[in-house]
Amino acid sequence: MADPELQLVARRIRSFPNFPIPGVLFRDISPVLKDPTSFRASINLLANHLKKAHGGRIDYIAGLDSRGFLFGPSLAQELGLGCILIRKRGKLPGPTVCASYALEYGKGELEIQRDALEPGQKVVVVDDLLATGGTMCAACELLGQLRAEVLECVSLVELTSLKGREKLGAVPFFSLLQYE
């Protein structure tokens, strides 16, 4: 890990064993948000990756409820794009589409407004962390229901032992930091 910006972000990630339930090692991104320099570095690193991987092909960044909302708008702003929200069920007005998913420590449902995108628009999904892949997989399913093209999913942290990347199938995935 030679990149100084990446080192800065990595130093800000904290670990909490047995949270929120026994057996889970929680990776806390709060210190990244608290430190404007490390937050800016995380956005720069993700934006640089997306510029190299996709150039100007991205139409929207989709932020996942709730910590994806912390990174999605800033990343979209950095790239000169709009940000759409994929929320937990019951949080969006108007007609929506819904998908169920399993989490590392529970179950849930996500939804998106039916008019959030036009068919064929290209989207990158962002969240703070990839664990089992359930949330990102559900987000990709929702975007597919709207006939959008998911170019890639990205996160700050990936928990590799939970193999969430595999759940995404053919959708490319990128993370800044990987932990067992």
UniProtKB/Swiss-Prot annotation:
Which biological process terms from the Gene Ontology are attached to this UniProt entry?
adenine salvage; AMP salvage; purine ribonucleoside salvage
Q: Which UniProt keywords apply?
A: Acetylation, Cytoplasm, Glycosyltransferase, Phosphoprotein, Purine salvage, Transferase
Please give the residue positions where the record annotates the modification N-acetylalanine: A2
Question: Which Pfam families does the protein's record reference?
Answer: Pribosyltran (PF00156)
* UniProt-annotated location(s): Cytoplasm
The organism's superkingdom is given as Eukaryota
UniProt key word rRNA processing: no
List of residues that carry Phosphotyrosine: Y60
Q: What is its EC number?
A: 2.4.2.7
Q: Which residues carry this modification: Phosphoserine?
A: S15, S30, S66
Q: In which pathway does it act?
A: Purine metabolism; AMP biosynthesis via salvage pathway; AMP from adenine: step 1/1
* Cross-referenced CDD domains: PRTases_typeI
Q: Name one GO molecular function term.
A: AMP binding
**Into which family does the record put it?**
Belongs to the purine/pyrimidine phosphoribosyltransferase family.
Task performed by this protein: Catalyzes a salvage reaction resulting in the formation of AMP, that is energically less costly than de novo synthesis.
Q: How does it assemble?
A: Homodimer.
Q: What is this protein called?
A: Adenine phosphoribosyltransferase
Q: Which organism is it from?
A: Bos taurus
